[in-house]
Design a protein with these regions (language model features):
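Short, well-structured N-terminal submotif of metal-dependent ribonuclease cores
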Residues: 1-36, 46-57
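A secondary-structure boundary/capping signal
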Residues: 4-5, 38-41, 110
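Nucleotide phosphate-binding site architecture
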Residues: 8-9, 43-46, 115, 123
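Acidic, PIN/NYN-like endoribonuclease modules and their adjacent C-terminal/linker elements
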Residues: 97, 101-125
Length: 125
């Protein structure tokens, strides 16, 4: 499973507040699955920290998938497909979607825009 940036932000906020919310519950429901992240999410998530070490300590609990050229080509294909249908994702979401499709793994996100991407199964939290 590939966790998108909004999931990471929600899970981090729940941990800071010491409460179980939707992201924590999702991790519990899928405790036998491996939650992975993209380098794109690392960039987006860490932008919210004055000290990148704080972000690193939190993100180190997840396995980061490599962004191979093939995943970038998938992102390009997704962009073409969505342009043809009259809509697009943002650049970061495009790369996250391309990574999920390249690896053939579900995407954990509340972003319904990902539902327009052929070949991706979105798991809402």
């Amino acid at each position: 499973m590939l966790a998108d940036t909004t999931f990471l932000i929600a899970f981090y906020a729940e941990r800071l507040a010491r409460r179980q919310g939707p992201a924590t519950a999702c991790l519990g429901r899928h405790r036998t699955d491996t939650f992975r992240i993209s380098v794109v999410s690392i960039a987006e998530f860490s932008a919210g920290f004055a000290n990148p070490l704080q972000a690193r300590v939190f993100l180190d609990m997840f396995h980061c998938l490599r962004l191979f050229p093939e995943a970038a080509y998938e992102a390009g294909a997704i962009d073409r497909e969505l342009i043809a249908s009259g809509g697009r994702l943002g650049e970061a979401d495009n790369l996250i979607a391309g990574t999920a499709r390249y690896y053939g793994i579900p995407l954990v996100s509340n972003g319904r825009a990902f539902d327009r991407v052929r070949g991706i199964r979105r798991i809402a939290y």
